[in-house]
Amino acid sequence: MRWLPFSALLLWALCLHSASADNNGVKKMKMQFATGPLLKFQICVSUGYKRVFEEYTQALYQRYPDIRIEGENYLPLPLYRHIASFLSMFKLLLIGVIILGKDPFALCGMQAPGIWVWSQENKIYACMMVFFFSNMIENQCMSTGAFEITLNDVPVWSKLESGHLPSMQQLVQILENEMKMSMHMDTLPPHQS
């Protein structure tokens, strides 16, 4: 009985520690080391946009060989990361308790609810349901739907604002316009006061 509050506190601390690693554990995808402008993609990897990023990168390198392209995961809000991390740990704890057959409600002096009795009679199904239901919620918390593009730290496309991915033609047109604009700005004489 004494270990229950301590283990809950320890589990919560582990969840917060693993979710607080913000960008430290995020793998950056650098496709080439060039000297030109920097095109940066922030994408939702769990949404399947990594393949789109790789296809766009190949096509853009063929068209603009001097461009630098980087891609990284667009992280959700910290609250959602903490919820997903907590669910991940809680899921493992709950599956362990189901497999061991220990009644946590008896430790608290409560009568076990019907769903707990069912989970003890059907351990495999109960563990599968906990695993898949928890994974569904975790994925929902971690999915941002983002496909954000910046050129030299200037936003040029946002799927979060537009609601759709840019076509390759749209992306090339945007890059052409941005590069022409920056070339035009570089050729202007400095303003004297």
Curated annotation (Swiss-Prot):
This protein's GO CC annotations: endoplasmic reticulum membrane
A matching Pfam family: Rdx
Entry PTM: May contain a selenide-sulfide bond between Cys-44 and Sec-47. This bond is speculated to serve as redox-active pair.
Protein family: Belongs to the SelWTH family. Selenoprotein T subfamily.
Annotated compartments: Endoplasmic reticulum membrane
Entry keyword annotation includes Iron: no
Protein known as: Thioredoxin reductase-like selenoprotein T1a
Catalytic activity: [thioredoxin]-dithiol + NADP(+) = [thioredoxin]-disulfide + NADPH + H(+)
Membrane topology: Single-pass membrane protein
Gene that this polypeptide is encoded by: selenot1a
Membrane-spanning residues: 83-101
EC numbers, comma separated: 1.8.1.9
Tissue: Expressed in embryonic olfactory vesicles and the photoreceptor cell layer of the embryonic retina. Low level in embryonic epiphysis.
InterPro entries membership: Selenoprotein_Rdx-typ, Selenoprotein_T, Thioredoxin-like_sf
UniProt function note: Selenoprotein with thioredoxin reductase-like oxidoreductase activity.
Gene3D superfamilies the record matches: Glutaredoxin
Keywords, alphabetical: Endoplasmic reticulum, Membrane, NADP, Oxidoreductase, Redox-active center, Selenocysteine, Signal, Transmembrane, Transmembrane helix
